[in-house]
Amino acid sequence: MQTTEKLHPEAIGLDKKSDLEILTILYEGQIEAAKCVSESMASLEAGAKAMADAVLMGNKLVYAAAGSSGLQGMADGLELTPTFGIPISQIKILRAGGLQDMSQPKGNMDDNKLAAKSDAEIIEPGDCVICLAA
């Protein structure tokens, strides 16, 4: 079983904890996750530069993800035009299972290699691919 699909140790007995205990567990988990960012600042800077360079050269920003990460990528990508004026033609979103009818969950799409290969055909030299994962 993948790590992201396993039950977190703090979730055991969660239904027996108070609301405050549950909120504290969730809050502390977010704080721990945020601490990881400081270790990745140089990589984040390089990624931001790659994105800016792609946009300035007229190339695409391509978000690639599955599941809820795909939804986050879509939300981020769609915000770039109104917020930063990046033409929508330079923003592409690849989500396992597609973007149509996202109100229905699609199982087993994350590992569809043929669909991934087909989706990836839009990527061209100079594009910046942003891969998101839970």
Question: At which residue positions do the language-model features occur?
Answer:
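Well-ordered alpha-helical segments embedded in enzymatic catalytic cores
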Residues: 21, 46-50, 115-118
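Flexible, glycine/charged-enriched surface loops at secondary-structure junctions
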Residues: 36, 44-45, 61, 65
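A short, well-structured juxtamembrane/interface segment
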Residues: 39-56
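Short secondary-structure boundary/capping elements
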Residues: 14-18, 43, 108-115
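Glycine-rich loop at the start of a catalytic domain that most often binds anionic cofactors/ligands
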Residues: 68, 74-81
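A short, small-residue-rich loop immediately preceding and capping a beta-strand
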Residues: 59-68, 125-134
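Cofactor-/ligand-binding subdomain signature composed of acidic, glycine-rich
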Residues: 1-36
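Glycine-rich oxoanion-binding loops at beta->alpha junctions
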Residues: 37, 81-133
